[in-house]
From Swiss-Prot:
Stretch list, region Interaction with tRNA: 145-147
Binding-site list for ATP: L6, L7, S8, G9, G10, V11, D12, S13, L33, G123
Highest taxon of source: Bacteria
Main location: cytoplasm
Role: Catalyzes the 2-thiolation of uridine at the wobble position (U34) of tRNA, leading to the formation of s(2)U34.
Keywords assigned: ATP-binding, Cytoplasm, Disulfide bond, Nucleotide-binding, RNA-binding, Transferase, tRNA processing, tRNA-binding
Subcellular locations according to the entry: Cytoplasm
Tagged with keyword Chaperone: no
Name of protein: tRNA-specific 2-thiouridylase MnmA
Keyword Transferase among record annotations: yes
Disulfide bonds listed in the record: C100-C195
Underlying gene: mnmA
Length: 355
């Protein structure tokens, strides 16, 4: 069996490689996907990904496995970065990591390697199960690290080629394995944030592409102007961090795109923003469209929290979702991801909040 392993230089993908080798497989080649964009590099002034490449080389040398660097900068910009910029311009909250997996890691990469490999291994926290000749995407044992949310838009064809060796482990167990076998990156911290940014701060990326535009920050309850911001695209509804005003904490309650106004409040559960019903479109199912939607739960962001809900399919590409509890951070552009027990069934893009 020929196996391709995607290595990022992090602990997770390195332990995934070790576990596949430990199972007795030897016909293995590793790949590092180069997806950062030249403009961002020149803007920051250095190459924050060189450390990744150094670790990839060290890991492959340790296990005597060949590796190759594949450049997907152009594809990534066209298929993921441009989408992110457009969503921010429209005042939405993008989820670029969903499309990074669908269009690049398991899209452009699969096209590049064609049918050279029987299996592609990564360090994602998720599980694949075969049932009645169908491949199911399941949540990982570690519900905090579970990444099924970001894998929700993969196809049957993509999932059929994948294996996630970390799906049955807790993050603490992965760290312990790394220490036990003395991996070169055993003490390396986990990466945070969007996959293509590396050490570039998210706000620096936004500023580079969309610039700055001064606008008022208004307290929702009083209507008073209490500050100035640099552009609505730097803020997400429900956001708490990054609001640099005294007498906090403050929460972003609403955005007026036309007037470039950010409304904030001390009250996290401000009724205007606590919603439970919304419309989604661009619906994607990993397998066939379900015949009924009973006992479904959804996530509206990455994390442990799931909501019980009622789903009403209006057309094949339009659905109304009613949560059993209100949520103060629902925002157009986010993705609602469908679950039944621990199976991830797919997802859809939120585009209109109803009530």
């Amino acid at each position: 069996m020929k196996i391709a392993v995607l290595l990022s230089g992090g602990v997770d993908s390195s332990v995934a490689l070790y576990r596949i080798i430990n199972k007795g497989y030897s016909n293995i080649k590793c790949y590092y996907l180069k997806i950062w964009v030249e403009d961002e590099l020149s803007y920051i002034g250095n190459c924050p990904w060189q450390e990744d490449l150094n670790y990839v080389e060290a890991i492959c040398n340790k296990f005597n496995v060949p590796y190759e660097i594949i450049n997907f900068q152009k594809e990534y910009y066209n298929k993921v970065v441009s989408y992110t910029i457009e969503e921010l311009k429209n005042g939405n909250t993008p989820s670029p990591d969903i499309f990074c997996n669908q269009r690049i890691k398991f899209g452009a990469f699969f096209e590049k390697i064609n049918s050279q490999y029987d299996l592609v291994v990564t360090g994602h926290y998720a599980k694949i199960q075969i049932k009645e000749s169908k491949f199911l995407l399941k949540q990982a044992k570690d519900k905090i690290k579970d990444q099924s949310y970001f894998l929700s838009h993969l196809s049957q064809k993509q999932i059929s080629k994948l294996y996630f060796p970390l799906g049955t482990l807790l993050k603490s167990e992965v760290r312990q394995i790394a220490k036990n076998i003395n991996l070169p990156n055993k003490d390396r911290k986990d990466s945070q944030g969007i996959c293509f940014l590396g050490k570039i701060k998210y706000n620096e990326f936004i500023k580079y592409h969309l610039g700055e535009k001064k606008g008022n920050i208004i307290e929702k309850e009083t209507g008073k102007i209490i500050g100035i911001h640099n552009g609505y695209w730097f803020f997400t509804v429900g956001q708490r961090r990054g609001i640099k005003l005294s007498n906090g904490p403050w929460f972003v309650i609403e955005k007026d795109l036309e007037k470039n106004i950010i409304y904030i409040s001390h009250n996290e559960n401000y009724l205007k923003q606590a919603k439970r019903k919304f419309l989604v479109h661009e619906i994607h199912w990993i397998n066939d469209t379900p015949t009924n939607f009973e006992n479904f739960k959804i996530k509206i962001r990455h994390g442990e929290k799931k909501y019980s809900c009622k789903l009403k399919l209006i057309t094949n590409n339009l659905m109304e979702i009613s949560l059993n509890k209100k949520d103060q951070g629902i925002s157009p552009g986010q993705f609602a991801i469908f679950y039944k027990n621990t199976e991830c069934l797919g997802g859809a893009k939120i585009f209109k909040i109803i009530e």
